[in-house]
Amino acid sequence: MSIDINWEAATSGPDGEALAERIRSFIHDKFQQIALPRFIRSVEVNSFDFGTVRPQLQIKDLCDPFEDFYEEDEGDEDFSDDQDGAPKHPPTIATERSGAGTWQAEHPSFVAGRLPGGIESRDIPAPSKEDLLASRPMRSPMSFGESLNPYFFPRAGTPGIPGGTSNLGYYMPLGGMSGTQTPLASVPRGPFSPGLRDSSVYGDIHNPPARDYPRPVHRQTDTDIDSGHSRPSTADTLNSINSQRISNPALSHPHSSNESHPDTRDHSPPPRRMHEKKPDDLQVLCQLRYNGNIRLSLTAQVLLDYPMPSFVGLPLKLNITGLSFDGVAVVAYIRKRVHFCFLSPEDADTLLGSEESNETGYIPGINPIGGGASGGAASSRRRDDSLLRDVRVESEIGRKEDGKPVLKNVGKVEKFVLEQVRRIFEEEFVYPSFWTFLV
């Protein structure tokens, strides 16, 4: 079924001008976020016009909307945070630290007998680095496949890592970390941070060590340090402390052999919040073909490197005077919302079948695709092409000789601008990206 569009009524008048200005502003903002090559100083989008040629639409299918269209937004007014199944926010680091401080305040006598100085509402000062280094012997080359003690990494400044890498042994084992366990909650902490202390210096603050958790000694021989089977690692001891005190599995070692305390938090991403499906939800798949005179005017500053680099910038005006388009549009109506996007050629062929089974020849000037022995080759070429075809560009700069611009970089600028226009279109309008309109 074909659809006739009153293109003039949709693109003219105050509403059409406002829509054209919004499109111009949108493309301009996207160009400001692009890293420009050395020979281009800036790109500005000056105007946008819909042209006079209307696109042609043919309805291909009516079906149920895609699952992604039912996903709730964070600020959706129709969604209630109190409903069952709503994901809970994990506790922050500040909350976890306050829990440890509360326990210390409730047991001052026990901690005062184990640790020097009063604790009150302040954190217990950590021992100096000189004392720690003096209590540890020189070690032989370590095995980086094992868990590493954090005190073997001094707080020397590491380029790009403020504060050094002294907390590497706590939560970032070099023996391979699972991609599903991200120690974000442990980033601000280290061996000298308040709230957590190394058990090899202080012991277990919350409870005396049980028989299942051997207490590490202060001094270790080279054999003990390099062998992962002769002593419990610091991460293992911290795992037992964290499981008893704050129940935070994000701080535990991913390869810990202690399995007596199961994780209380799921490492998988939170489930998506979805709209409820209704019988009146509808999705339309349309074949959209366009070969018109849509116009887009841009100005780029081209840098001249003679007699010195970036000597002067010349304005280069680029006018996109028309383009050809062939693609499948998706329009879905769900609960007073209209979702709109285009399908990539591969998705369109999967959903609607290959080009050989579709009718062709909608618009003069676009070669029909399919038919005969050349249909497969044409379909293969279509998969490699962009949805935007045959973008026609006119450039204006300085004096021309034999119909060609004098500057050598004009061709590079045109190619760069066209590539970015295609990239913006595909990233913003091709599924799984889509636009939602309230109706």
Swiss-Prot record:
Start-end of Acidic residues biased regions: 71-84
Domain of life (superkingdom): Eukaryota
Assigned keywords, A-Z: Endoplasmic reticulum, Lipid transport, Lipid-binding, Membrane, Mitochondrion, Mitochondrion outer membrane, Transport
Bias type Basic and acidic residues, positions: 212-229, 256-269
Record localization: Mitochondrion outer membrane; Endoplasmic reticulum membrane
GO molecular function: lipid binding
InterPro entries documented for this protein: Mdm12, MMM1_dom, SMP_LBD
CDD domains, sorted: SMP_Mdm12
Domain SMP-LTD span(s) in chain numbering: 1-439
Subunit structure comment from the entry: Component of the ER-mitochondria encounter structure (ERMES) or MDM complex, composed of MMM1, MDM10, MDM12 and MDM34. A MMM1 homodimer associates with one molecule of MDM12 on each side in a pairwise head-to-tail manner, and the SMP-LTD domains of MMM1 and MDM12 generate a continuous hydrophobic tunnel for phospholipid trafficking.
Domain remark in the UniProt entry: The SMP-LTD domain is a barrel-like domain that can bind various types of glycerophospholipids in its interior and mediate their transfer between two adjacent bilayers.
Gene from which the chain derives: MDM12
UniProt region (Disordered), positions on chain: 71-104, 182-278, 362-385
UniProt record similarity statement: Belongs to the MDM12 family.
Any Pfam family hit: MMM1
Membrane topology annotation: Peripheral membrane protein
GO annotation terms (biological process): mitochondrial genome maintenance; mitochondrion-endoplasmic reticulum membrane tethering; phospholipid transport; protein insertion into mitochondrial outer membrane
Protein name per the record: Mitochondrial distribution and morphology protein 12
Location, primary (coarse class): mitochondrion
Summary of the function given for this chain in its UniProt record: Component of the ERMES/MDM complex, which serves as a molecular tether to connect the endoplasmic reticulum (ER) and mitochondria. Components of this complex are involved in the control of mitochondrial shape and protein biogenesis, and function in nonvesicular lipid trafficking between the ER and mitochondria. MDM12 is required for the interaction of the ER-resident membrane protein MMM1 and the outer mitochondrial membrane-resident beta-barrel protein MDM10.
